[in-house]
């Protein structure tokens, strides 16, 4: 546990800095970025649903870059197996012992790209991790970082070769966000800003800088827990 503490004013300032960094690379989508920040501070997971070309994957990459968190990306495909996500215990012939080979889920911010393109058996590999922030392999539980956050994406247009997420999986997400197409003005700005790039730029190429670290993110989430929730608000919810 970090010894760093933050006030709510400092949390607000940090959130503004993160918005600013993501805004250097992502045109528009401010509501989506705000929801990502909310989920981060509430320690919940996010499902981004939108058509191709709405910067879902790139937005998650920029978000991770600004936070300074460990980042992994898994491209979900029909042949992806649970072990490709979680890892496995492999026998070491030199030591005659099993050695844990950690999968990409052992990170702080996991981008589960096109999560609905993999079968339910593989989707289920995320259930324990998202609910309990741990992974069990061969009967042994392995803790995930306190800041563990899953940002998943899916394309609602495709109907061939996709596997709709079951209710148990959807329940693990705090938010399902519908990512819209950019406006005409935003599209013009995207062309002006990125039209000269031969391929998709990286966040660092567009000036996205780290403004936080794991300890700061944990402290910010802890500070948010101090907000008083009035009974009238509870009744409204």
Predicted regions: what they are:
Residues 46, 110, 148:
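Conserved beta-strand position immediately N-terminal to the Walker
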Residues 50, 113-114, 125:
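Walker B catalytic acidic pair
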Residues 7-51:
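Pre-Walker A (pre-P-loop) alpha-helix and adjacent loop at the N terminus of AAA/AAA+ ATPase modules
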